[in-house]
Every structure is written in C-alpha cells, then in structure tokens.
Amino acid sequence: MKRSKAYRAAAEKVNLDQLYSPEEALALVASGASAKFDETVDVAIRLGVDPKKADQMVRGTVNLPHGTGKTTRVLVFATGEKAEAAREAGADEVGDDDLIAKVQGGYLDFDSVVATPDMMGKVGRLGRVLGPRGLMPNPKTGTVTMDVAKAVSDIKGGKIEFRTDRYANLHFLIGKVSFGSEKLAENYFAALDEILRLKPNAAKGRYLRKITVSSTMGPGVQIDPVAARDAD
C-alpha cells in the first residue's frame, strides 16, 4: 500500500521499536498530523481477556473532560413528556413507531441511540440494524433510561462508549489533533482509568497488552502498557 508523503514524514519521527509514555506518544501524534482537516485521534487497546466468556467482556462509557470534538447525532425513542425533554436537550431525531419505521426503511444518519425502557420492546425489532453497528440502546451504557435529557446531554457533551471486540480489542476516540497533546492526554487518562476500573476479576495475567494511538491519516504510535498507569 502506497503511503502519502505526509504520512511517511510523520512515520519518520516515530521509532516503531520504541514504547512511548502516553504524553510522548500523544505529542508525536499531534505534531505529526498534516492533513488539511482536523484529524481525529484514536486509541486501540488489546486487553488480556477472553471475550468469548461473558464474565470477561469489558464494556462501558466515560465522559471525556474535553469532549470529542465531534458533532454527534443522537436519535431518541420516547413518547410524551420524555420525547419533549429529549428534544429540549438537543436530540436530533425523536419519535416512536414512526421513527422505528424510518430506521427499518434504511435511515441511518445518526451516531448514538437512546430509548426509554417502555420503548425497548418495539426498539428490539431494530436489532439486526442497530446491533451490528453497536447502536442498540443498553442499560449498562445509560442509553436505556427514563432520564433521556441527561443521556442526550452526556452524549452531546463528549460521552463515549467502548466494548471489546471478538479479538479482545477496544477502539475509541479521544478528541481532535487541534486539542493539543495536554488535553488529549487528559481525555486519554479519563478513558483509561475507567477501563482499568472495569477489569474483570476473571482476567488472567497482564490486563493491558498493547496500546496504540494514531491520528486519522497518521502512523500508529505505541504506548508502553506498563507506563500507561498501574497496568498489572
């Protein structure tokens, strides 16, 4: 795969054999970005868990102190006063049966979904559409709730979700290159602390196996898992 000149220039600053501290890695990512748009900064973490076992699934949410820098479109399934509260909180789409039909018809212009508990029986029909995209509302992530206004405000304000995939990897964003390395680091540590808090009791050996940060168009920079926090 042929890389761009800007990518190669950024990659030259990174020692692929070196494990960096979080601050060093994020400084390299921020300084190496050269695209004409404000690149997103992503984190990939390989965990020492067995995702095939239910008691080792790592899933959670965290409110990033500096937000994500991304405009998040939130869809809410609710009726009556709850629907009105969601609209006032800034939800992009609010509805019940009509909105379910719209999504079934192929509408997917949203990034997050919230629902009141009484709507989940109907929202369950959308499992084949929302499930594979990681968009199905879930009580564990605060997206099945009676307080839809708070859920919408949290998501709009920088709340992110993460969950292990079948290879025990987590993928999530921590902001934009324009944030600068200091704010990116604060967002990174907020997410990492929550991931460490959620370490399954059944997990064996080292929990944080590999951590890589990168910008949208830049090379991956590896963070030393031991230096990431008290990793073991």
From Swiss-Prot:
Parts of the chain that traverse the membrane = none
Q: What functional role does this protein have? A: Binds directly to 23S rRNA. The L1 stalk is quite mobile in the ribosome, and is involved in E site tRNA release. Protein L1 is also a translational repressor protein, it controls the translation of the L11 operon by binding to its mRNA.
Ordered alphabetically, the record's keywords are:
Repressor, Ribonucleoprotein, Ribosomal protein, RNA-binding, rRNA-binding, Translation regulation, tRNA-binding
Q: Which Pfam families match?
A: Ribosomal_L1 (PF00687)
What is annotated about its quaternary structure and interactions? Part of the 50S ribosomal subunit.
Name which cysteines form disulfide bonds.
none
Protein name per its UniProtKB record? Large ribosomal subunit protein uL1
Q: Does the keyword Transit peptide apply?
A: no
Protein encoded by which gene? rplA
